[in-house]
Amino acid sequence: MPRASLALLLAAAARAAGVDYPDQGAQAMARGGAFAAKADDLTAIYYNPAGLAKQGGTRFLLHGNFVDQRLSFARAPRLDSGGAVQQRFDEVESTDGIYPVPFVAASSRFGLDRWTFAAGLYGPHTAGNRTFPKCIGVEANDSPDPCGGEEENYAPQRYLLTHQEFITAFGTFGAAYRVARWLDVGAEFQWAYSTVVLEKATNALGSSLPSSDVIIRLGGEDGKMVDRFTPAFMVGAIARPARGVEIGASARPPLTLRHEGEVDLTPSQTLQDSGVAISPDPARATLVMRLPWVVRGGVRYFREEQGFETWDVELDGTYERYSVVDTIDLEFEPSLQVDSEALGASTIEVFRDPNGWSDTWSARLGGGYAFRRVGPGALMLRAGGNYEAPTQPLDYTQLGFTGWKRFGAAAGAAYRWRGVTLSLGYSHLWHETREVTDTRFMTYDTVAGPPAPGQRCRDVEDAIHCTPIGNGTYRASIDLFAVGLDVAFDELLDRSR
């Protein structure tokens, strides 16, 4: 059981974090995510806490976003040392359904003129679950050889990913203060709770033969790796330098998640029969994942008539410093012991895997138009679009993380009556199709010597012991739906009407 091949686990685990899709909340999503300056509902605790100062009285928000994510991978044929095709692979697709992303928050001024306080709970706006087949044409079982041992029955993407669940919830406590008529500031404390489950395979001999597979499960057989508490913070400000103009900005410093739990490693029956053993079984480990600086900024222009906002347009930019997320670490305690009759014993204390991620930026343009009297209430129409630069270089492309270049278009509507607002939103994200021919993901055998950091299979001296597993065609398509309920209780209960 080569130590080097296990490092592929981290390549998949690292990308379980993903990036958010634009964007949280029914109003903001329908505007293409352009909300850093407007921030006039309780999703301000996600975009810009200074926006809480705009919201008087006591309020409640319950929004639900729903992510329909479709991923596919057509692995490139496996070639022999002379370049002849040894094996062709079927295209595989993710089998997940619609993933819900709830958002709940409440706020009150508690009778104070300048202060607003809020509390809420939400998660990243992304699909936390991704599932791909383990087997092709047969039902998977729970044995060390889940597809029966026949090579053609094993899914071609199994070395990248078969299943992952990455769930993070931010319990948030925030406050905003109106410094002056033209300036609001806000800050918040967040309690991050996170869980990880991941399953994939690696190969002990640098081939694609299932007889050499090792199945890896972060979270063990039935559990999860858990980080029960990591503190996070956010600050923001909104300025109104001229009539009808707002400028907003917010920043969240980086944070480090430390997921503790079991790691189960199951060698194939062939490897077990040949004397490969891994202990302890299951192992105990900590998966260390870093989340980057996130800085948002936006400027908007709006028009009001007798205190009622009739229309607005906003342009936002977001910067995420993913280059500082340089490694993902898996720390074993106690150390992992790998015994092999052929290769002897080795001890593993920590894997440290480089990411290759780059800083990324995005632009969001959106706005709304409101009709003051439609029946007993007001009707708001919203639309927007966005562009996001890639986080993930082409040679680091794989299935656990889709930080690719993408474009989005969105639209939605809302109806408000006596302090109660019902909102709907829809967005579609177009991802670039990625053709990868020089992947950094491979299986390899320490008998031949592992590649140095940054090498690919073409750099390995004895390439027969190195098999590229990430070359091929990657496609992604995302549909986002949102519904929302907002209640302003002071307006709802106003009996003077």
Q: Which positions does each model-derived feature cover?
A:
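Outer-membrane beta-barrel translocator/receptor signature
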Residues: 39-47, 53-139, 155
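Bacterial N-terminal signal peptides that target proteins for export
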Residues: 1-5
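Outer-membrane beta-barrel porins/channels
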Residues: 17-35, 99-497
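N-terminal signal peptide c-region/cleavage motif recognized by signal peptidases
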Residues: 11-14
